[in-house]
């Protein structure tokens, strides 16, 4: 059987670019490039079932709403559907005044003529002309010499200008040329062809040209592509009239890196697709590129504030699901299952809230510094609810976060540890994820259902009574409301428990009214062993009694000694509604 190792001799390393004094490694990305979305052309042509007219229109409207100003709307001579869609956009005046459409065409006479006709009546448009220039395609696909290949590009440019002059006189017409398979083409030949094309177009102020350099098939390391782009930027004539554009593909999985390094090297425009759709492994992902800039403090000029709606529309139009791990947009990219990650995230949120309170500011106005989360999910329309999800790998931090964020219960640290063991045991037994609602039910079963009876309090405002059931015996306690916990302490002391109640009352939860619930956490220590109980009630005394009794009874149910211990009640406010 052949092995992959034995086949490596069939492949060779990509030849590096000799570039003394390269400057791009010392540069930074300080502003956004020009963006072009090719979802409706390169993305659409890669689909097993191309978009219907309705889906194309939905994609176009999404791109416009996000702020893309250059949109490649199709390949009009490739299909009647593409031609008809372009006509709908023009004839129904669906192209906003600040948006420029683009169409692709090969450097062939009849194709160029038909493409120009498809644009009749368009207010603004760019014709994107291309021909393959790599040695492999010249030799194997077209049987052309270098001069013949260059002449094809030159003649295509002349034909485009001739037909456009006759048909598109009122159109604000732009011109783009791409040496297809640029990254596989000799650099000197790419430059030669581009210079010949510019000699025909004659770029000047107000009449620039887009020279677009695609990694039609990604073969090299990103730094090699950056060297190619810097070499071109150095050597192109009329550079001030050239918009140096790139079109990275993702065959090696490094399209984003290639694009970012190319920006450092002088690229000024990027073509790509939302969520990386496109031929084979896809085009560069415009979402990833834009939000990478956003997280470095650079405004991408694109609205990603509702990433879920963007994703839903793209999935519906493409008929392809976005991977749950796709950067910024996948279902799981803001989620942690690991216990150590969850603990760090919880501490990060706690620190942000403390800092916000200290400054008297909203959390959303503070610099984002959060373990494991490079982007605030709320900045792209996500919530914090899915940041922490619970399974057998989760620890106290994750459990505590879910109880606080979902259910408004801020558990004392030792109770976090105690309950985490309960949740982890359940996750091990069941397998899979434990939902927040399931976590709450486990909490209620474990800590709120340990008493035989609810804690009864007399209806009077001064005198209260309650009952304790310990080891099968009932003990009634009556006292002034202010002395209820002390009375319980005295009763339990007679049975060998030293009860100490510590009330911690802080800021009320979301419900700050007089009827807001409070949560009381009681820690019962019996001969050095610990049992926890919880009480939740609008009446703080009722909650305290329920918590202490729950803790004592849980100790008994665990077969702990019934005497010779102590119980401690800790009272804290409920942080969020939801009993």
UniProtKB/Swiss-Prot annotation:
User: According to its UniProt record, where is this protein located?
Assistant: Cytoplasm
The record ties this protein, via Gene3D superfamilies, to: 3.30.160.270, Aldolase class I
The cofactors named for this UniProt entry are: Mg(2+)
Which of the seven top EC classes does this enzyme belong to? transferase
GO terms (BP aspect)? L-leucine biosynthetic process
Output the Gene Ontology terms for molecular function. 2-isopropylmalate synthase activity; acetyl-CoA C-acetyltransferase activity; magnesium ion binding
Give the record's family classification.
Belongs to the alpha-IPM synthase/homocitrate synthase family. LeuA type 2 subfamily.
User: Know the name of this protein?
Assistant: 2-isopropylmalate synthase
* Gene giving rise to this polypeptide: leuA
């Amino acid at each position: 059987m052949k092995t992959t190792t034995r086949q490596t001799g069939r492949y060779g390393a990509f030849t590096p670019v000799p570039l003394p004094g390269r400057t791009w490694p010392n540069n930074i990305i300080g502003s956004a490039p020009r963006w072009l979305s090719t979802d409706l052309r390169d993305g659409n042509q890669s689909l097993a079932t191309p978009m219907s007219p309705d889906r194309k229109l939905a994609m176009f409207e999404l791109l416009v709403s996000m702020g893309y100003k250059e949109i490649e709307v199709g390949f009009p001579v490739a299909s009647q559907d593409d031609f008809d869609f372009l006509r709908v956009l023009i004839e129904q005046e669906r192209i906003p005044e600040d948006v420029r459409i683009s169409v692709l065409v090969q450097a062939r006479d009849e194709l160029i003529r038909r493409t120009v006709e498809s644009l009749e009546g368009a207010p603004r448009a760019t014709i994107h002309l291309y021909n393959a220039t790599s040695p492999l395609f010249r030799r194997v696909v077209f049987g052309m010499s270098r001069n013949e290949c260059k002449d094809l590009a030159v003649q295509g440019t002349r034909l485009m200008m001739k037909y456009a002059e006759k048909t598109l006189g009122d159109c604000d017409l732009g011109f783009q040329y791409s040496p297809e398979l640029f990254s596989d083409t000799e650099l000197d030949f790419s430059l030669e062809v581009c210079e010949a094309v510019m000699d025909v177009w004659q770029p000047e102020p107000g009449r620039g040209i887009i020279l677009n350099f695609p990694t039609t098939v990604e073969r090299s390391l990103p730094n090699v592509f950056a060297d190619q782009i810097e070499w071109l930027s150095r050597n192109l004539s009329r550079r001030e009239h050239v918009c140096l554009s790139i079109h990275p593909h993702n065959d090696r999985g490094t399209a984003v890196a290639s694009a970012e390094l190319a920006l450092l090297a002088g690229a000024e425009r990027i073509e790509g697709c939302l969520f990386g759709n496109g031929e084979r492994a896809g085009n560069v992902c415009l979402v990833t590129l834009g939000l990478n800039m956003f997280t470095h403090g650079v405004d991408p000029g694109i609205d990603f504030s509702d990433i879920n709606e963007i994703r839903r529309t793209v999935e519906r139009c493409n008929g392809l699901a976005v991977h749950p791990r796709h950067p910024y947009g996948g279902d799981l990219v803001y989620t942690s299952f690991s216990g150590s990650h969850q603990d760090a995230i919880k501490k990060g949120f706690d620190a942000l809230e403390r800092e916000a309170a200290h400054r008297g500011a909203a959390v959303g106005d503070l610099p984002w510094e959060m373990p494991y989360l490079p982007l605030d999910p709320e900045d792209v329309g996500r919530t914090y609810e899915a940041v922490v999800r619970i399974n057998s790998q989760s620890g106290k931090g994750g459990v505590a976060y879910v109880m606080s964020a979902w259910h408004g219960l801020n558990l004392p640290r030792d109770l976090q540890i105690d309950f985490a063991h309960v949740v982890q045991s359940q996750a091990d037994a069941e397998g899979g994820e434990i939902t927040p609602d399931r976590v709450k039910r486990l909490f209620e079963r474990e800590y709120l259902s340990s008493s035989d009876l609810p804690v009864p309090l007399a209806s009077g405002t001064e005198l209260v009574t309650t009952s304790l059931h310990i080891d099968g015996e009932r003990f009634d306690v009556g006292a002034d409301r202010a002395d209820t916990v002390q009375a319980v302490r005295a009763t339990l002391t007679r049975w060998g428990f030293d009860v100490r109640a510590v009330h911690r009352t802080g800021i009320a939860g979301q419900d700050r009214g007089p009827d807001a619930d409070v949560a009381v956490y009681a820690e019962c220590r019996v001969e050095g062993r610990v049992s926890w109980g919880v009480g939740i009630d609008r009446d703080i005394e009722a909650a305290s009694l329920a918590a202490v009794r729950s803790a004592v009874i849980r100790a008994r149910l665990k077969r702990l000694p019934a005497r010779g211990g102590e119980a401690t009640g800790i009272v804290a406010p409920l942080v969020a509604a939801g009993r």
